[in-house]
């Protein structure tokens, strides 16, 4: 399962933040997806394939161990691993609005180091979805 929460993203856009019960977490210095993460992503892929007007952003994060540069690289690789897996599950490349790593720039002090080795996914209404809603479709 997953929790969804309406949020403002880093660009102050309305988004739905998707948090999976199992988390999309990674081992130290790794961008390899766990079986739990793959199962969660397969469920997300089904939703994204049903509504191809939904765009997503994938943001990779790290703990604070190691250099800034190393953490930026690992966080990007984590985001790319999620993007590649979702594409392997049939999600259209056009749905990926943003795929990036932020290293430990957005480190969450309320989480443990292992919980900060994560990827966060945001879902957005596409331009077409917004136009359809405004037109009453």
PLM regions with names:
Residues 3-4, 25-60, 87, 121, ...:
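Periplasmic peptidoglycan-binding/anchoring modules of Gram-negative envelope and division proteins
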Residues 12-16, 20-22, 29, 52-54, ...:
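Envelope-exposed proteins and targeting segments
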Residues 23-25, 32, 73, 106:
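Residue-level preference for alpha-helix termini and adjacent loops
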Residues 61-137:
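Periplasmic OmpA-like peptidoglycan-binding domain that tethers envelope proteins to the cell wall
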């Amino acid at each position: 399962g997953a929790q969804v929460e309406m949020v403002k993203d880093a660009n102050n856009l309305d988004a739905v933040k998707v948090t999976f019960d199992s988390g999309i977490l990674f081992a130290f210095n790794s961008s390899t997806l766990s079986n739990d993460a793959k199962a969660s992503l397969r469920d997300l892929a089904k939703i994204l394939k049903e509504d191809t007007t939904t765009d997503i952003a994938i943001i990779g994060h790290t703990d604070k161990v190691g250099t800034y540069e190393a953490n930026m690289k690992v966080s990007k690789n984590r985001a790319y691993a999620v993007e590649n897996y979702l594409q392997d599950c049939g999600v259209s490349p056009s749905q990926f609005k943003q795929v990036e790593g932020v290293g430990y720039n957005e480190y969450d002090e309320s989480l443990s180091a292992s919980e900060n080795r994560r990827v966060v996914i945001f879902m957005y209404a596409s331009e077409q979805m917004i136009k359809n809603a405004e037109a009453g479709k």
